[in-house]
Amino acid sequence: MDRYELYLELARVHHQDPLTWHGTNLRDHHIDAINQLIQKHRIESILDYGCGKALHHPPEWRATLYDPAVPKYSTPPQGQYDLVICTDVLEHIPEEHIDRIVAQLKQYSKGWLYVSVCCRLAKDKLTMPNSMKRYNAHVTVKPQAWWRQRIQGERVILKFTD
């Protein structure tokens, strides 16, 4: 199993716990900015890539939800969207797969790309069932400049959280 598959499986296990990963990062840090973007640019179609449990999405967004670690949302999206949202996701992906995932995000976007990345180790430690080995939830921890080099474009909004 390569590191991408390992972290995907760790995320699947973690998402099964109803007490973890509620998507509060989106709710607490990004909804207002995203709503302003939607209104200002008359955005009609939205993809949340890495939506997690999708507990805090405003219903008026009518977003397409995708998360390969959540069975309910694991069907890959089709087409392009006016806005692609990807918050608190990329730091959970091994470095050797970042460029591929960013390319996917850009392919799904026919308009705006809103990305938020955390640049520090996570408080969460992930484990596989029946294993003592613990993995930090943030596998790719890089400075902001590193992320800026990989995620850039005319209609890209890149935010950082601590």
Placement of each model-derived feature along the sequence:
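Conserved N-terminal segment of class I S-adenosyl-L-methionine
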Residues: 1-81, 99-102, 108, 119, ...
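A conserved beta-strand element that flanks and buttresses the S-adenosyl-L-methionine
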Residues: 85
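Hydrophobic adenine-recognition pocket in adenosine-nucleotide-binding enzymes
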Residues: 89-92
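Short glycine-centered segments of the SAM/dcSAM-binding site in methyltransferase folds
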Residues: 111-114
